[in-house]
């Protein structure tokens, strides 16, 4: 399933804390890492990994060995036939992901991973601000993000293919965000 997921050009990644139980009943903090395909990918899949830490190295390791994708140029820097995943990675602002978006020092490798911010995480921060402080600015931001979400809902409701949905998003997103 991981090999199929890594054929995607768009992936979503996120990590959430969990409690890991040891053999003697001891408890440790761990994280469940989720990697999901984008909504327009040919496969709808999620791969979960449970790790004892939150280090961004876990995401780097997951993306390290991707099978070749047809018609997609990738940087080869592993064993023959093994290539690092490249594409658009949708993540929150957790610092652990940042190393994925820059070349490795001293190696000169272009990782070809493009950071895509997650609107759900942005929206949650404005929602928390609105609840805590009844912020008028947060209320405006929530309304504009909601209008942005409508672009995607409308595209799915109309059954637009990826190219059509992308064109709509490019045409309608900025005006909706700017109000």
Specify the residue positions occupied by each region the protein language model found.
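Catalytic center-proximal scaffold of phosphoryl-transfer enzymes
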Residues: 1-179
């Amino acid at each position: 399933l991981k090999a199929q997921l890594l054929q995607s050009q768009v992936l979503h990644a996120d990590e959430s804390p969990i409690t890991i139980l040891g053999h003697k009943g001891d408890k440790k903090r761990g994280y469940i890492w989720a990697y999901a395909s984008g909504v327009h990918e040919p496969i709808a899949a999620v791969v979960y990994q449970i790790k004892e830490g939150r280090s961004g190295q876990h995401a780097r390791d997951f993306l390290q060995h991707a099978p070749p994708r047809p018609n997609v140029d990738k940087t080869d820097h592993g064993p023959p036939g093994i290539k690092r995943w490249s594409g658009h990675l949708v993540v929150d602002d957790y610092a652990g992901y940042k190393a994925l978006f820059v070349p490795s020092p001293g190696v000169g490798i272009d990782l070809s991973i493009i950071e895509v911010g997650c609107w759900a995480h942005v929206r949650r921060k404005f929602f928390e601000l609105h609840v805590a402080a009844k912020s008028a600015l947060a209320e405006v931001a929530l309304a504009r993000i909601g209008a942005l979400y409508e672009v995607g809902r409308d595209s799915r409701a109309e059954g637009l293919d990826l190219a059509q949905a992308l064109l709509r998003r490019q045409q309608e997103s900025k005006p909706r965000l700017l109000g």
